[in-house]
Amino acid sequence: MPDYSYRPTIGRTYVYDNKYYKNLGSVIKNAKRKKHLLEHQEEEKSLDGLDHYIVAEDPFLGPGKNQKLTLFKEIRNVKPDTMKLIVNWSGKEFLRETWTRFVEDSFPIVNDQEVMDVFLVINLRPTRPNRCYKFLAQHALRWDCDYVPHEVIRIVEPSYVGMNNEYRISLAKKGGGCPIMNIHSEYTNSFESFVNRVIWENFYKPIVYIGTDSGEEEEILIEVSLVFKVKEFAPDAPLFTGPAY
């Protein structure tokens, strides 16, 4: 005779087919992934029109003529765990001789000339042989005119100087470009207004600190220069006429 009494120890066994059951987290993640993919595709479609244009990954190596002007070369001693101020571009007098040389001697004087960018380039070299360390740099572009920077600061989140021990800073403000029209008259009429309206209205004044990751005091040869990225316009007509042109 069968026993129909209730026994809680006897349970029931269910077999689930994984084909119809999925992890809830995987379902949600997959849905979000599909949503992000669709949004990304829509965003890419809106940028398809830019495929007809070419830009340089490094603006310094992009189109245009680089006009270099060396400001100074000198040797500085830098103690460990500190950075020394090497560029303090706070005054107009610093530019007087610089721009006189730039405009009169080496700048190609033509109308409709456009300076697309100005780079402050700092080249660093150890003066002692067989030294193994890396150069550090830190700079600021925006600060109050009354601010007086310290000559020496502690190393806090610096940047390592990259290839060829060269540190480049773009001084162009957002939007860039500095179209200089009638540069002769603008420069001749008033040097102060030329500096204020043409230079500082379009470019930042930087301050730069340099250091090393060495545990000893190091002697560094510093070369500071300005590189002007000048836009080159194509001529309206060829310079020569004939079968070859």
UniProtKB/Swiss-Prot annotation:
GO terms for cellular component: viral occlusion body. Coiled coil: none annotated. GO terms for molecular function: structural molecule activity. Keywords: Viral occlusion body. It comes from the Viruses. Belongs to the polyhedrin family. Major component of the virus occlusion bodies, which are large proteinaceous structures (polyhedra), that protect the virus from the outside environment for extended periods until they are ingested by insect larvae. This is Polyhedrin. It comes from Anticarsia gemmatalis nuclear polyhedrosis virus.
